[in-house]
């Protein structure tokens, strides 16, 4: 029998809610009467091209998430729930090690981005299969200034080639796992997964994300997310 490779998604949901004014994981804050992370899982759960979901959660949260979210909402594709690490890259690495061995493509997505669309997910998989790595991003709208330590402007880059990076970040599984296996101390400053590949000289493609694909980190973001969901329901 032919071995059919899998497409997996790692949902990183280990962040705290300090900027939300909460002392617990922001992923469990209610968005239209459902936890934020439940909205995120649901998008991937409903896609035929996604075979398994790996959840990375905060320390001591595995059983809570299993009983309060996975069982309550009946998610079937969640194959593993693992605890995160000290930094985001540690959490992602834990997730990568929990992925099925027959995985060919892996998406890494923020649990706090529940407004991701299926079109972006599908395009990211196609591009990653062809190129090895791609990220969703949107062109920056504001002028960006680079300063020195004295808060003096030293350069104003052209906006034409500046992108605000989102998730999913999608990779050929063997490629991103190898990159994480060979992390160097300098990679500790990496703020996204693509940077770890970039450090090894790999090319990372960009696909257009969406300005609605926000990461919910503040109370204001929650209000915006509720309005976006309302607009989608009403077909506006």
Swiss-Prot record:
<comment type="similarity">
    <text>Belongs to the IspD/TarI cytidylyltransferase family. IspD subfamily.</text>
</comment>
<keyword id="KW-0808">Transferase</keyword>
<dbReference type="GO" id="GO:0019288">
    <property type="term" value="P:isopentenyl diphosphate biosynthetic process, methylerythritol 4-phosphate pathway"/>
</dbReference>
<comment type="pathway">
    <text>Isoprenoid biosynthesis; isopentenyl diphosphate biosynthesis via DXP pathway; isopentenyl diphosphate from 1-deoxy-D-xylulose 5-phosphate: step 2/6.</text>
</comment>
<dbReference type="InterPro" id="IPR034683">
    <property type="entry name" value="IspD/TarI"/>
</dbReference>
<feature type="site" description="Transition state stabilizer">
    <location>
        <position position="19"/>
    </location>
</feature>
<dbReference type="GO" id="GO:0050518">
    <property type="term" value="F:2-C-methyl-D-erythritol 4-phosphate cytidylyltransferase activity"/>
</dbReference>
<keyword id="KW-0414">Isoprene biosynthesis</keyword>
<comment type="function">
    <text>Catalyzes the formation of 4-diphosphocytidyl-2-C-methyl-D-erythritol from CTP and 2-C-methyl-D-erythritol 4-phosphate (MEP).</text>
</comment>
<dbReference type="InterPro" id="IPR018294">
    <property type="entry name" value="ISPD_synthase_CS"/>
</dbReference>
<protein>
    <recommendedName>
        <fullName>2-C-methyl-D-erythritol 4-phosphate cytidylyltransferase</fullName>
        <ecNumber>2.7.7.60</ecNumber>
    </recommendedName>
</protein>
<feature type="site" description="Transition state stabilizer">
    <location>
        <position position="26"/>
    </location>
</feature>
<dbReference type="InterPro" id="IPR001228">
    <property type="entry name" value="IspD"/>
</dbReference>
<dbReference type="InterPro" id="IPR029044">
    <property type="entry name" value="Nucleotide-diphossugar_trans"/>
</dbReference>
<feature type="site" description="Positions MEP for the nucleophilic attack">
    <location>
        <position position="215"/>
    </location>
</feature>
<feature type="site" description="Positions MEP for the nucleophilic attack">
    <location>
        <position position="159"/>
    </location>
</feature>
<keyword id="KW-0548">Nucleotidyltransferase</keyword>
<dbReference type="InterPro" id="IPR050088">
    <property type="entry name" value="IspD/TarI_cytidylyltransf_bact"/>
</dbReference>
<dbReference type="Pfam" id="PF01128">
    <property type="entry name" value="IspD"/>
</dbReference>
